[in-house]
């Protein structure tokens, strides 16, 4: 059947002239034989097969088709497989570079110091919570605390702490408590009752608290220091101390009874007595917040108190006494360092039912700072010839700002207060005086040219007198403005306002 079909096709091709010359058939190379039977003979496209393979003879084609070895080269059929390319030679392995020699290890760093502040050493150090009663601690070495309490909560009753030996660094003693008899530091808490603390070395503070979170309580304590730059009680870096029913004395030069040093702190006293008898040894020297309730604070040879930068003193039923013997005859000085002038914040001084005593000079000197002074039902005793308030610039010699640009700026509030004394300002300074709550002020206001010829301040003296309060003039006065709801007794004197208005009876 297949043979008859093939024969018929060949005849049809011959009749249409599709057959090729014999010479072309002889010149063509024979087709390669299939490696294996790829498809059965059924379904072969004979016309296509003959057109692709006319170089073969009819018997050859017929025989190949019948045996299934003739290659079907129709477009629908798969093309012969191409030979696989010869595998590429494997690349020679790259030589690994020789490893670099390892560097010698760096020397191990020195162990970190236990504290960043230089506080020196300690003869005895307590680092565990507990009660330590009836103990005795002493040190006679330089830069050494007799007792140090670090990061521990302790109580102690009836202890004795003595210290001799000078500091090698007055700065470290002041800022960090180096060489203090008692140092509580780095968050330690110490409650000491009936304790006796004494020191004889320079820079040997009696009791010192350092750093935020540190707290010292002294109850019925006796603290004394005799060396120079040896405060009675002191805190810094936001530490806190409370002194109750205690006595604190210092006799050395520049040894205040109460001191708050760098970056402030809080020091509270109740019914305690503080005395500083050395030269330039203030009763209070503060860069923090001091509250004195009851008791006395006395400086025998200098100012009663110095308030530096943004800090405060509050007196409640207490006595603050000074006896200035130096070039600045004032009892309470409020100032700022040159780099602190203009910093946001206000110094504070408040006296409630208190007594302020100045044995030489006026009571308040305000320069190079902004402050608020509140006097309520307190008694002021001073040299009658000196102003009660002197609010002026300064020559810069003490480092209190630049001359001509370091005026004082004060808000003064009198509440239930009887005050006698004049007020002196210069043209780069100002006062805002508020007389209220049935207060009576007897005195005058004088505005003098700034000695360094600084640019005048926009206002110099603004006075407000509330209903029920009184101003008794003792001399002609110059002010910027007046708001009066109370009473003014001119006593034959005048008040001249900044706009030229002259007020008189």
List where the protein language model places each region.
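Gram-negative bacterial Sec-dependent N-terminal signal peptides
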Residues: 1-25
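Low-complexity, acidic Ser/Thr/Pro-rich repeat tracts that form intrinsically disordered stalk/linker regions
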Residues: 24-129, 133
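N-terminal segments that cap or nucleate solenoid repeat domains
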Residues: 53, 109-170, 495, 502-505
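Extracellular beta-strand/beta-solenoid scaffold signature
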Residues: 112-121, 141-148, 170-183, 201-209, ...
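All-beta strand scaffolds that present successive hydrophobic residues in beta-strands
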Residues: 129-134, 153-159, 189-194, 215-220, ...
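Fold-core signature of tandem repeat domains
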Residues: 137, 197, 209, 216-225, ...
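Post-signal peptide N-terminal segment of secreted/secretory-pathway proteins
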Residues: 156-208, 216-225
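Surface-exposed loop/turn positions within long extracellular repeat scaffolds
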Residues: 457-463, 471-483, 496-497
């Amino acid at each position: 059947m297949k043979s008859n079909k093939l024969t018929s096709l060949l005849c049809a091709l011959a009749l249409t002239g599709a057959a090729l010359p014999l010479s072309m058939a002889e010149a063509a190379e024979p087709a390669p034989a299939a490696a294996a039977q790829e498809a059965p003979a059924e379904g072969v496209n004979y016309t296509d097969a003959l057109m692709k393979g006319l170089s073969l003879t009819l018997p050859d084609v017929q025989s190949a088709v019948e045996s299934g070895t003739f290659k079907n080269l129709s477009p629908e059929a798969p093309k012969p497989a191409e030979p696989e390319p010869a595998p590429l030679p494997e690349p020679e392995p790259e030589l690994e570079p020789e490893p670099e020699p390892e560097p010698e290890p760096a020397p191990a760093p020195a162990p970190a110091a236990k504290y960043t502040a230089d506080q020196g050493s300690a003869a005895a150090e307590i680092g565990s919570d507990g009660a330590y009663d009836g103990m005795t601690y002493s040190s006679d070495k330089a830069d050494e605390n007799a007792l140090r309490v670090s990061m521990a909560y302790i109580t102690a009753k009836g202890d004795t702490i003595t210290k001799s030996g000078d500091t090698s660094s007055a700065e470290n003693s002041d800022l960090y408590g180096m060489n203090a008899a008692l140092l509580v530091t780095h968050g330690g808490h110490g409650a000491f009752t009936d304790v006796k603390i004494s020191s004889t070395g320079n820079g040997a503070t009696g009791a010192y608290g350092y750093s935020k979170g540190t707290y010292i309580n002294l109850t019925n304590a006796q603290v004394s220091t005799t060396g120079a730059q040896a405060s009675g009680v002191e805190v810094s870096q936001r530490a806190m101390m409370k002194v109750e029913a205690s006595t604190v004395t210092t006799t050395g030069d520049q040894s205040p009874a109460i001191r708050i040093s760098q970056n402030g702190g809080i020091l509270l006293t109740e019914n305690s007595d503080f005395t500083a008898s050395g030269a330039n040894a203030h009763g209070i020297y503060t860069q923090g917040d001091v509250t004195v309730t009851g008791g006395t604070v006395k400086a025998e040879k200098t100012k009663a108190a110095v308030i530096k930068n943004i800090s405060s003193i509050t007196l409640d039923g207490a006595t603050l006494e000074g006896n200035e013997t130096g070039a600045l005859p004032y009892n309470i000085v409020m100032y700022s360092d040159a780099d602190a002038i203009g910093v946001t914040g206000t110094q504070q001084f408040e006296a409630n039912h208190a007594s302020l005593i100045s044995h030489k000079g006026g009571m308040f000197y305000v320069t190079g700072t902004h402050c608020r002074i509140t006097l309520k039902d307190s008694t002021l005793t001073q040299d009658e010839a000196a102003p009660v308030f002197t609010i002026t610039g300064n020559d810069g010699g003490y480092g209190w700002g630049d001359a001509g640009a370091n005026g004082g700026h004060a808000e003064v509030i009198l509440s239930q207060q009887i005050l006698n004394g004049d007020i002196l300002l210069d043209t780069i300074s100002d006062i805002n005086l508020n007389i209220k709550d049935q207060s009576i002020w007897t005195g005058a206001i004088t505005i003098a040219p700034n000695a360094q010829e600084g640019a005048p301040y926009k206002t110099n003296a603004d006075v407000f007198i509330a209903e029920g309060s009184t101003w008794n003039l003792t001399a002609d006065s110059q002010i910027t403005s007046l708001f009066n709801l109370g009473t003014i007794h001119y006593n034959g004197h005048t008040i001249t306002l900044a706009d030229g208005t002259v007020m008189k009876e």
